[in-house]
Amino acid sequence: QSVKDELNTINKLKEKDYTSETWTILQDQVKLAQEFIKKDEATITEKEVIDMVDALQKAKAQLVTKVSVSKKELKDYIASNELDKLDTNKYLTSTADSFKKALKNAQTLIEQEDATKEQLDEALKQLQDARTQLVLKATDDEVNALKALMDQYQEKDYTASSWKEFEKVYNDVKDALENENTSDNVQALTNTLKEAAQKLVKRGNLD
């Protein structure tokens, strides 16, 4: 392998694919090699040629691609936040689905040989956004507390006209609980129910 052959191989590399620090190290070595091949061949020993080829190969071997840096960033973000172990059942399905999709996309790109830096950077951004947009569901305790409160109101205890008004709100709350809710939703529903209950009129004692 001659120094010229090695330089020709290096010339085919594209600067935009590599980190600037590692590219600079390679180019410094290339400059030395270019000076070296200008020398009179009669003055160059075989050992010097072997050493120069070796130095060029080492400088080429230390190149770090921008893609590998982006992959590492993405891997580190997933690992440090333990995203692959996250219990997505704790979150509203709509937000959990977006997150799962972003995580799957990121993991696919990490394994992909031909992933570009742009794709990887975009995947990281989407994953970060999806993580911050995850919204916790209300806990079972919070939902059950509201259901228990609802059970306390029985139609037989109140006048027909006041129950009729209350029942509209009661049914709205009941319908809302059929869907997923955040803690704030459950708190708001509880307040709405309590407010409506204040207008209930107890039936007179008929004994």
Model regions: which residues?
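Beta-rich interaction/scaffold domains
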Residues: 1-207
